[in-house]
């Protein structure tokens, strides 16, 4: 159980860094929010194994990033 939680947190951390690097080139907040939403959609559609393949963490991390950016 601890291993799954650690993996989930690591996935969220890595995804948030990747999301920031991808979306940082956008200058318009509307465009930035649209890119964050698209990334969230793509990451939530990937995979089917949940925590074991990291998609649950990526999906959760993407949703948090969209909310954190005020979109």
UniProtKB/Swiss-Prot annotation:
Disulfide bond residue pairs: 33-71, 44-59
Signal peptide: 1-23
Keyword Acetylation tagged: no
Keywords: Disulfide bond, Enterotoxin, Secreted, Signal, Toxin, Virulence
A Pfam match: STb_secrete
Superkingdom, natural source: Bacteria
Cellular component GO terms, alphabetical: extracellular region
Compartments in which it is found: Secreted
GO molecular function: toxin activity
Biological role stated in the UniProt entry: Toxin which activates the particulate form of guanylate cyclase and increases cyclic GMP levels within the host intestinal epithelial cells.
Protein name as catalogued: Heat-stable enterotoxin II
Organism: Escherichia coli
Lineage: Bacteria, Pseudomonadati, Pseudomonadota, Gammaproteobacteria, Enterobacterales
